[in-house]
């Protein structure tokens, strides 16, 4: 008997801004209990905010005086149709509208202070479940390799981008 296994990988999320995480995700004890359902980045006002993933914008608008952009990831990213990724706390660029496709790293607006990043898993017939996006953020790491001694100087190892999670696979 031959067994085949398929390893599905997901594309890492690009941090929407280039600052460290200021506030971590805090899992609420119940569906409607208090908790921090986003990770937040402290960012100077007016700095560019980038799309964390390629996909179709399903919402671009203001909620309680803050701009939010929700992206349904493209099929090639590995996330599937049940995942939505939202960036909040920004002033949205005029060309960022619902139904438009964005590329990873494309500017979607400018910071209005604290930038929020959230992930939701939506299953048919069930409430949306928030997921900690931290494990999906891309991290730079050097590739380890052995270099034989040849008397010449060593070459630098390439830097790879990795994320430790795969979404439910």
Kindly label every feature range from the protein language model.
Residues 2-13:
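Hydrophobic alpha-helical targeting segments used for export or membrane insertion
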Residues 43-45, 90-96:
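Short, solvent-exposed loop/turn positions at domain surfaces
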